[in-house]
């Protein structure tokens, strides 16, 4: 089970990689980010903290830092997901794909696989898809306009925005 969002750019792969590898980069393009602080940077073993607009905080633990992006684990007391940031392309154009692989047991309070699947398809998947679309749209806006996005720029999210 996963959700993903992809964006295409008429920009060099190296530029896009540089943007997603900047410490604290979510401050510039994540529409639900209150603050993003790097504690250890860069490369494998990097750690940062993402605080959402609603005050919820998660640590992000980076691994598999490669020439095409990185993977990270995000969570608090529980690991909520593994997230893949992957860039492919050339010196003229490229794409960014962000995939969220949730640890479904930490989203659903039921152990029954059937109930987990129902929750996944009817509630969790649409919420995560909306979330990752907003994040990738924020990144696309940021790199295309060379300006930071506003909080909730593409609409609020019930899990991460403050109401």
What are these regions (language model features)?
Residues 11, 54-56, 66, 89, ...:
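Beta-strand elements of well-folded, non-transmembrane domains
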Residues 6-10, 61, 86:
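Generic structural detector for well-ordered beta-strands
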Residues 22-24, 34-36, 58-62, 111-116:
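Short amphipathic alpha-helical segments, especially helix-boundary/capping motifs
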Residues 6-7, 31-32, 55-58, 107-112:
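Short hydrophobic/aromatic-rich motifs at helix boundaries and adjacent loops
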């Amino acid at each position: 089970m996963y959700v993903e969002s992809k964006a295409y750019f008429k920009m060099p792969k190296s530029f896009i990689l540089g943007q997603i590898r900047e410490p604290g980069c979510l401050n510039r393009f994540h529409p639900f980010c209150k603050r993003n602080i790097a504690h250890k940077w860069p490369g494998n073993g990097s750690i940062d903290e993402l605080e959402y607009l609603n005050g919820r905080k998660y640590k992000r633990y980076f691994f598999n830092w490669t020439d095409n992006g990185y993977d990270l684990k995000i969570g608090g007391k529980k690991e909520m997901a593994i997230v893949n940031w992957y860039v492919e392309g050339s010196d003229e154009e490229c794409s960014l794909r962000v995939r969220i692989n949730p640890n479904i047991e930490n989203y659903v309070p039921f152990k029954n696989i059937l109930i987990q699947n129902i929750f996944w398809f009817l509630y969790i998947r649409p919420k995560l898809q909306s979330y990752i679309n907003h994040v990738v749209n924020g990144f696309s806006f940021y790199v295309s306009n060379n300006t930071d996005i506003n909080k909730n720029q593409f609409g609020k999210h019930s899990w991460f925005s403050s109401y």
